[in-house]
Amino acid sequence: MIPGELMPAAGDLTLNEGAEALTLMVANTGDRPVQVGSHYHFAEANPALDFDREAARGLRLDIAAGTAVRFEPGQRREVPLIPIGGARRIFGFNAEIMGDL
């Protein structure tokens, strides 16, 4: 074994299985690229991103852990979002929640 080596089970792996996804259209209205990580509270993402922030409350991107989605200036795309798991308590980010969802 090599330190950090991953040995996944044989066959297909399904990420976030059973999580109910919501798809939102997101547009980067800024003049610079914006990148959002897999576990970032999406409602608190960069203000240059235009989307329904109320609908995104308590949600994160439905992508593999440790990855991110990049929005180029002027780009519009649909993104799938899933509920933040665990105790559903949010601290940090842009300090808009700071507690229970």
Swiss-Prot record:
Heterotrimer of UreA (gamma), UreB (beta) and UreC (alpha) subunits. Three heterotrimers associate to form the active enzyme. Signal peptide: none annotated. It comes from the Bacteria. One of its GO terms (biological process) is urea catabolic process. Belongs to the urease beta subunit family. It is an enzyme of class 3 (hydrolase). PANTHER family: UREASE (PTHR33569:SF1). It catalyses: urea + 2 H2O + H(+) = hydrogencarbonate + 2 NH4(+). Its EC number is 3.5.1.5. It comes from Ruegeria sp. (strain TM1040) (Silicibacter sp.). Pfam families: Urease_beta. The keyword Acyltransferase does not apply. Pathway: Nitrogen metabolism; urea degradation; CO(2) and NH(3) from urea (urease route): step 1/1. Keywords: Cytoplasm, Hydrolase. It is found in: Cytoplasm. Gene3D superfamilies: Urease, beta subunit. GO terms for molecular function: urease activity. This is Urease subunit beta. GO terms for cellular component: urease complex.
